Amino acid sequence: MLSFKSLLAAAVVASSALASASNQVALYWGQNGAGGQERLAQYCQEADVDIILLSFLNLFPDPLNVNFANQCGNTFESGLLHCSQIGADIKTCQSLGKTVLLSLGGGVGDYGFSDVASATKFADTLWNKFGAGEDPERPFDDAVVDGFDFDIEHGGATGYPELATALRGKFAKDTSKNYFLSAAPQCPYPDASLGDLLSKVPLDFAFIQFYNNYCSINGQFNYDTWSKFADSAPNKNIKLFVGVPATSNIAGYVDTSKLSSAIEEIKCDSHFAGVSLWDASGAWLNTDEKGENFVVQVKNVLNQNACVAPSSSATTQSTTTTSSAVTQSTTTTSAAITQSATTTSAAVATKSNQIVTSSSSSSSSIFYGNSTTESSTGIATGTVLPTGSNENAATTGSGSNTKLAISTVTDVQKTVITITSCSEHKCVATPVTTGVVVVTDIDTVYTTYCPLTNSQVYVSVKTVVCTEETCVPSPTSTSQKPKASTTIKGVEKGQTTSYPVVGTTEGVKKIVTTSAQTVGSSTKYVTIELTSTITPVTYPTSVASNGTNTTVPVFTFEGGAAVANSLNSVWFTVPFLLAAFAF
């Protein structure tokens, strides 16, 4: 088995050919999401396409099968689809300089591993049927794909790191070409199905789905979170793609103007590589006034937002100044932060479980495990001084005098958590707005209440400072001021969240949280009293509408049908022709 260093070296070599480009377009093909899907070779004739992802190998490990909607119907004796035309087109695409990856998983399919051993063994199957190995039943005949993409959206996370590692070992045996590994996580970080794979195996690309979730481009776009992950990823050179829908009837779609604004903010990130599109059929139908398809439009956006590197002298000066400031700040505050960790964790776990489940509800919703704060509805700042200190010592911020002051900041924020809301056997990912109260500095307490109130929340913070058995109360009240966006840790996956039915009301809830911290001879007690009037939850605008689009957005993960109320939908997701007769 290859060592981790060998795997990393292989990943770096494989991605070197594409590493310098930040204007690449990756295109998912195979699911006929918008109808009228043409054969693969036609899309590869488009010069602006750089990477093709064949979607999907959606049944594995046993039974094993692929699904390319209207593009493959012949089978081997075993029932495995035999797609000779696609095999010929793969070689055509590769001759035109396209990278062709086979994507595993998708939103519709039956796949996953019960144990690590079966996942590791499955690498042999993939290599022999789609790679440079040998097998009597090869769906693409003698065509060899350039690697594999993991678009795992259900079925658990077991075995995927081991499978990817085993595939890297297979790649090392064939030096005739470069091979690639990629993943297509949904934008909430970390991804429930692909988190382990991304954190344990050096991958070349991540095609992040910035749609169907609260973190889409027209929502709380969290590319920065993924860039920070990439900084510490097993492959430090991993390239990130911003995944967007190619047609306006899919939730999270943005036009080229909004896409350009988003790219403008991230274009100089060292990990940014381009945009991935779902899917090919839709991209060719989505034309502008010039008749250019969406792939060309996106490539133009990327070319127009090329990063211009600053001069070397200016960069050096800025780096030196920043380093000095950060070092000084860390030295002053690190001791206080370390001391508060244990107390905070206990308070969060207890209060979160008690409050989130207290509201009445007509349905139970499962929280995905990620939350991000929006603009704050209120923030107030107060300073409490230990006995014997003076105001100047607390506010100068220099030398050892700063350590004597205990600063209390109360922050009333709005937070969006994503839950799965189910009704009549239909489930959608739904962002729900909740409230969060934060008291920071020595102590940090997160108290989440659901749903958000329809008016301002009053928070009373009572601080008591004790020195040599003498205690002096020092109350602090909040005012309502805006606060920039931040990210906080969400509730653990599996937490059940309830919320009232629209049209109902509830009474007043009071939440009291107390924590204490001792610094030297001083002990500070902080009590939060939150009075919240619970009001009906409105259906989130990101779910109820799709911007200016008058059609109801279709909530579909990759592999799901993208056109609603159409008999053609069956052909988008069902590989067997007999299924159509049910309609």
UniProtKB/Swiss-Prot annotation:
Keyword Glycoprotein recorded: yes
Gene3D superfamilies: Glycosidases
Molecular function per GO: chitin binding; chitinase activity; endochitinase activity
Residue ranges annotated as propeptide in the record: 561-583
Reaction equations catalysed: Random endo-hydrolysis of N-acetyl-beta-D-glucosaminide (1->4)-beta-linkages in chitin and chitodextrins
Topology within the bilayer: Lipid-anchor; GPI-anchor
Active-site residues, as the UniProt record annotates them: E153
GO BP terms, alphabetized: biological process involved in symbiotic interaction; cellular response to starvation; chitin catabolic process; filamentous growth; filamentous growth of a population of unicellular organisms; filamentous growth of a population of unicellular organisms in response to starvation; polysaccharide catabolic process
EC number: 3.2.1.14
Secretion signal, residue range per the UniProt entry: 1-19
Changes after translation: The GPI-anchor is attached to the protein in the endoplasmic reticulum and serves to target the protein to the cell surface. There, the glucosamine-inositol phospholipid moiety is cleaved off and the GPI-modified mannoprotein is covalently attached via its lipidless GPI glycan remnant to the 1,6-beta-glucan of the outer cell wall layer. Proteolytic cleavage by SAP9 and SAP10 leads to the cell wall release of CHT2 and increased chitinase activity, suggesting a direct influence of SAP9 and SAP10 on CHT2 function.
Keyword annotations: Carbohydrate metabolism, Cell wall, Chitin degradation, Chitin-binding, Glycoprotein, Glycosidase, GPI-anchor, Hydrolase, Lipoprotein, Membrane, Polysaccharide degradation, Secreted, Signal
Glycosylation site residues: N370, N546, N549
UniProt GO cellular component terms: cell surface; extracellular region; fungal biofilm matrix; fungal-type cell wall; side of membrane; yeast-form cell wall
SUPFAM superfamilies assigned: (Trans)glycosidases
Disruption phenotype: Leads to the clumping or clusterings of cells from early exponential phase, and to increased hyphal growth on solid media.
Subcellular localization, as worded in the UniProt entry: Secreted, Cell wall; Membrane
Lipidation sites (GPI-anchor amidated glycine): G560
EC class name: hydrolase
Residues of the GH18 domain: 23-305
Induction per the UniProt record: Expression is positively regulated by BCR1 and FKH2. Transcription is greater during growth of the yeast form as compared to the mycelial form, and down-regulated by micafungin treatment.
Family: Belongs to the glycosyl hydrolase 18 family. Chitinase class III subfamily.
Protein known as: Chitinase 2
Species this protein is from: Candida albicans (strain SC5314 / ATCC MYA-2876)
